[in-house]
C-alpha cells in the first residue's frame, strides 16, 4: 500500500529532523492528500448514508448534518471542505503549543483511524469523527480543559459556553483559518504567556538554569563557590550579564533585587534562604505555572477591556485598569489560608462605596470566635453592639452566654462607624453571594509583610482613599473633596458609582511583563497545584515529556 509507506516516511522524517515545523508541514501535506484521495474514490450517495448513521448518536451533530443533506463537512474536493480540513489539521497540530492535551488532538490517532480505509462506511464515520474532534477542540479552547468549580469550589468563573451546533454553523459560514484564530482567548496576557511558554521550553530542552545553589545564605561581599553558583544561575535566568566575578558585588546585589521584585518579595538584594529557595525552583515548575495560567486565561474570556478592577490574590494587590493601563495600584490583605477563610475567585460589578461603614459581623465569626470569648467574659467584645432579632441593643452583662451554642445563639453583632471599625473608614461593594467586598482597615502594620493572608476572606486595602479617589474621578472633577465631605458626616454615607465597574478577583502565580519575561508568585492556597494535577490527568504534559 502506498499510504502506509507515506505514514512511515512521515514518522521517520519527524524523528530524524526533530524539528516541529518540518513535522507539521509533513502532517498537513500527508493528511490532506490522504483525506482527499480517499474521498475521491467514494460514492457520494453511500457516504451520505453512513454520515447520517455515524452522526445519529449526537443530537446536535445529527441536526447539523441533516441541515447539509448529510454532505461531508471535511472530506472531498469541495473548496470549502478542503479549507476547513487544512485549518483543522493546523489547529490540532498547534494544540500542544497552547498547553492542551496532545493525546486528545493527536493527528496520529486520526490518521491511524483512516489507515487502509476503502469503504464508504468508514469514510462517513471519519467525517463525523473529525466533526467531534473539532467540537472538543473548540470547547476546550473557549472554556478550558477543566471545569473550575470541580477543582476548587472557590474558583467561580462564568465560562463562555456555546452550543455545538453554533460552532459548526459559524465555521461553515466563516473563513476557516480566521475562525480558528477567534477561538483563542482574546487577552494580551494569553499571547504573552504563549511566548513565555515557548521560551521556557527552549531553556528546559537545553538543560535548564544550571546547578542548584547549595548554600543556606550568602552575604554581600562574600566570595567563594556559593557566590559563583548564585552568579551562574542568575546569568542563566537573564538577571545578570556574563561575568567571572566570584564576589557578591554590587552588580550581583542588583540582580538579586530584580529577581526578588519579579517574585513579589522584599527587594533588599540579600540572598537569604527564602530567596535562594526561589532561585532554585526548576524550569519545569515554572513551566507548570505558565501552563496553569494559560488554562486560567481560557476560563476568563469575559475579563474587561475598558475600566475594571483586578485583585490578584497571589500578588496581594488591587489595581484599577483603564484601557489596558494600570492607573492605580495598592497592596492588599487577603483571606487566611484556611478552608473557611480563603478568598474566592469570581467576577462581579463594583456598584457603590460606603463611607463610615458599620461592620455587621458575619454569623460565622459571631458564633465561632466571639461566643466562646463571651462565655469567659461578658465584656470581651465591648467594642461591638449586641442586638436581638428586633434590632434592640442588649447589655451583655444581662446575658448568660454559657446557655448558648453555635446553633442556638440568637443575637447579632454590629460595630458602629469610627476609626477603629474593622472595616476602617470605607468599604467598596459588589453585592455577591460570598459576601466579599474591599475595605479599609485600622490594622495597617500587616501591609509591611510580604505574605499578607490574614482576613476572613474579604480584601483589605492599604490605600483605600486613593482607590476611592480614582474611582470617583470618573464622575467628579474633585473626587477627594467629594469623598472627604462624606467622611465628615461621621455616619454611613453611600456613594453610587455612576458607571459601575467590573471587578475580577483572580489568582495568577505566573504573570507576564509588558517588556517580556515573567513574574511569579507563591501558590498561597495550593489551587494551582490542584489545577496542574488535573491537567496532567487530562493529558497535558511538559515538553521534556513529549520529546
Feature locations, PLM:
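N-terminal secretory signal peptides that target proteins for export/translocation
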Residues: 1-17
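Well-ordered beta-sheet/strand-loop patches within structured domains
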Residues: 38-66, 128, 132-135, 155, ...
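Short coil/turn segments at secondary-structure junctions
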Residues: 10, 117-121, 218, 243
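Cationic-aromatic interfacial patches
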Residues: 41-160
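Phosphate-/polyanion-interacting regions in eukaryotic proteins
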Residues: 152, 164-171, 180
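Short, intrinsically disordered, low-complexity terminal segments
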Residues: 11, 17-20, 36-39, 51
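Bacterial N-terminal signal peptides
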Residues: 19-33
Amino acid at each position: 500500500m502506498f499510504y502506509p509507506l507515506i505514514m512511515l516516511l512521515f514518522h521517520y522524517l519527524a524523528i530524524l529532523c526533530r524539528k516541529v515545523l518540518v513535522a507539521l508541514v509533513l502532517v498537513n501535506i500527508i493528511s490532506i492528500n490522504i483525506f482527499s484521495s480517499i474521498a475521491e474514490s467514494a460514492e457520494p450517495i453511500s457516504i451520505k448514508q453512513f454520515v447520517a448513521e455515524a452522526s445519529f448518536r449526537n443530537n446536535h451533530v445529527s441536526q447539523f448534518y441533516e441541515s447539509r443533506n448529510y454532505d461531508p463537512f471535511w472530506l472531498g474536493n469541495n473548496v470549502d471542505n478542503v479549507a476547513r480540513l487544512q485549518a483543522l489539521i493546523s489547529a490540532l497540530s498547534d494544540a500542544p503549543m497552547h498547553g492542551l492535551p496532545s493525546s486528545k488532538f493527536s493527528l496520529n490517532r486520526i490518521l491511524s483511524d483512516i489507515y487502509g480505509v476503502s469503504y464508504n462506511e468508514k469514510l462517513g464515520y471519519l467525517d463525523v469523527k473529525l466533526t467531534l474532534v473539532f467540537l472538543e477542540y473548540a470547547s476546550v479552547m473557549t472554556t478550558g480543559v477543566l471545569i473550575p468549580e470541580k477543582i476548587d469550589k472557590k474558583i467561580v468563573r462564568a465560562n463562555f459556553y456555546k452550543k455545538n451546533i453554533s460552532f459548526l454553523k459559524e465555521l461553515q459560514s466563516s473563513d476557516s483559518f480566521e475562525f480558528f484564530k477567534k477561538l483563542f482567548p482574546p487577552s494580551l496576557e494569553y499571547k504573552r504567556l504563549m511566548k513565555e511558554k515557548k521560551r521556557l521550553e527552549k531553556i528546559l530542552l537545553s538543560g535548564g538554569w544550571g546547578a542548584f545553589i547549595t548554600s543556606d545564605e550568602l552575604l554581600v561581599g562574600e566570595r567563594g563557590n556559593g557566590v559563583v553558583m548564585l552568579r551562574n544561575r542568575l546569568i542563566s535566568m537573564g538577571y545578570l550579564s556574563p561575568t567571572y566575578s566570584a564576589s557578591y558585588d554590587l552588580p550581583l546585589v542588583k540582580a538579586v533585587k530584580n529577581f526578588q521584585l519579579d517574585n513579589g518579595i522584599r527587594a533588599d538584594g540579600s540572598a537569604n534562604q527564602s530567596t535562594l529557595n526561589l532561585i532554585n525552583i526548576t524550569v519545569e515548575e515554572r513551566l507548570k505555572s505558565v501552563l496553569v495560567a494559560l488554562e486560567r486565561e481560557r476560563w476568563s474570556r469575559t475579563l474587561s477591556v475598558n475600566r475594571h478592577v483586578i485583585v490578584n490574590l497571589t500578588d496581594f494587590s488591587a489595581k484599577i485598569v483603564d484601557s489596558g493601563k494600570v492607573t492605580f495600584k495598592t497592596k492588599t490583605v487577603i483571606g487566611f489560608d484556611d478552608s473557611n477563610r480563603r478568598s474566592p475567585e469570581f467576577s462581579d460589578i463594583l456598584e457603590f462605596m460606603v463611607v463610615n461603614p458599620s461592620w455587621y459581623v458575619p454569623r460565622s465569626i459571631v458564633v465561632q470566635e466571639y461566643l466562646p470569648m463571651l462565655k469567659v467574659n461578658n465584656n470581651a467584645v465591648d467594642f461591638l453592639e449586641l442586638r436581638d432579632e428586633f434590632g434592640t441593643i442588649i447589655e451583655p452583662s444581662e446575658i448568660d452566654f454559657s446557655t448558648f451554642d453555635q446553633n442556638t445563639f440568637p443575637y447579632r453583632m454590629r460595630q458602629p462607624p469610627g476609626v477603629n471599625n474593622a472595616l476602617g473608614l470605607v468599604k467598596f461593594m459588589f453585592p455577591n453571594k460570598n459576601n466579599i467586598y474591599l475595605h479599609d482597615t485600622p490594622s495597617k502594620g500587616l501591609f509591611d509583610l510580604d505574605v499578607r493572608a490574614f482576613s476572613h476572606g474579604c480584601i483589605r486595602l492599604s490605600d483605600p482613599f486613593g482607590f476611592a479617589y480614582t474611582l470617583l474621578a470618573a464622575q467628579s472633577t474633585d473626587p477627594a473633596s467629594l469623598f472627604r465631605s462624606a467622611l465628615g458626616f461621621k455616619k454611613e454615607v453611600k456613594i453610587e458609582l455612576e458607571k459601575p465597574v467590573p471587578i475580577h478577583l483572580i489568582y495568577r502565580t505566573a504573570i507576564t511583563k509588558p517588556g517580556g519575561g515573567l513574574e511569579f508568585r507563591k501558590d498561597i492556597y495550593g489551587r494551582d497545584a490542584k489545577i496542574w494535577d488535573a491537567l496532567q490527568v487530562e493529558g497535558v504534559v511538559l515538553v521534556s515529556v513529549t520529546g
